[in-house]
Amino acid sequence: MVKNCIKKNVITANKDLLAVHLKLLEDLAESNGVALKFEASVAGGIPIVNAINNGLNANNISKFMGILNGTSNFILSKMTREQTNFEDALDEAQRLGFAEADPTDDVEGVDAARKVVITSYLSFNQVIKLNDVKLTGISGTTLSDINAADQLGFKIKLIGKGTYENGHVHASVEPTLIHKTHQLAAVENEYNAIYVVGDAVGDTMFYGKGAGSLATGSAVVSDLLNVALIFESYLHTLHPEFELK
């Protein structure tokens, strides 16, 4: 359906679609002279797509890593803070609306893996498939694991990661030991954060709400406004008297 619609500007938050067809859709949009915007597809309210495409476009990005799924992060945060087991933390996430009735994609890392595929394309200009992402979820993470990590000075976080070396992308989503002094260790509950390394800027980090209707809505409306500005600029070229109010 989106392929048929791509003759007009398209705004989507559908990460399932983009993780499989992003390159095709971008090529179609370019050939048809229209915009394809998808800020809400990665990390909710964090403007990471715009940051990579525009703010960091003077850099060669070698690595990104981050907390890309709010449900999993909420569960791990609750297990750590309240010393509860995975099942009870998941029940609470579902009760509060942070987890779906079927949480499989979130807790098994599939949702985060889709975001890694999209972010790898943006960061490295390389197409990878979901099956290329080394994937381990958090359903097997126990309270004993969390406490053992704590005694060593670490927290367990579900980390999505992509690195670009020698023309190849290495991508993974897996529970990872993050030292308590690292910025990612302080990211709690439904919040997301993405750590990006560029050759000019060095280390950068983006933080914010990764889920929720307002965070997602903010990203979608931002895309809508950007498309409107593109349209205004084009129309003003044809008709200088026109100005978008």
Predicted features along the sequence, with ranges:
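General beta-strand structural signal in soluble alpha/beta enzymes
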Residues: 10-13, 36-40, 63-66, 206
